[in-house]
Amino acid sequence: MKRAIVTGGAGLIGTGICEALASAGWDVASLDIREGTGAARQVICDVTDESSVAEAFDSLGWDEIDLLVNNAGIAKPYGGPLAEMSLAEWRRVVDSHLTGAFLVTRAAIPRLRAGGSIVNMASTRAVMSEPETEPYAAAKGGLIALTHALAISLGPRIRVNAIAPGWIADGTGLGPRDHAQHPAGRVGMPSDVAEAVSYLASAGFMTGQVLVLDGGMTRKMIYED
């Protein structure tokens, strides 16, 4: 049985990934600061803390894994005006997305089987911008750069790719206008991201790439009335 570790496995996207992989027959472990669903083994872990990551891997006890999904991070992209932001606030966001991915990847590399895969969860905010999202955008942009570098460093034994989701929601509280903004005709769902993870886990000739999963939003020109 193939083994997968998903960080941030208790969140909206992480839960979808864990459930999809478990349904496909994977043995899945969720590393998160809180417990998630029963689809995965639950390992409490703060990915920004070096000792917590080491303890999580020791607790899990897996000597070999096939897939690492670096999905953990503070979901709220808006951080307020940069001129008013404290260093602690900046570090909190960047550490949760980027430093956490470094710490977990470092721990996972010796355990990844040949032919294994790493999938980093980036964001369309790394390639297009909104006001007051600087720490989030910087962290996600860093994840894309980390993906490129790791693909070269770890290949050909390990493949490394990233997914850049756009608007992903559980479907509640959305109206026709929300869906109509997307050329695909709808807002994305966690299952869309999970399908992309499954694809990248099996795509043997794909590495160092960023899969933009946004319903076409980054290709659409939007003009305000």
Model-found features: residue ranges?
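Residue(s) in the substrate-gating loop at a strand-loop-helix junction
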Residues: S123
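Alpha-helical segment proximal to the catalytic Tyr-Lys
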Residues: P110, A151-P156
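Canonical Rossmann dinucleotide-binding motif of NAD(H)/NADP(H)-dependent dehydrogenases/reductases
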Residues: M1-D27
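Active-site helix of classical SDR
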Residues: T105, A139, T147
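Substrate-binding pocket helix/loop in short-chain dehydrogenase/reductase
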Residues: G79-L82, S86-R91, D178
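C-terminal substrate-recognition "lid" of short-chain dehydrogenase/reductases
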Residues: R111, R186-L213, T218
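Conserved Rossmann-fold SDR core element
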Residues: I144, L154-I168, M206-L213
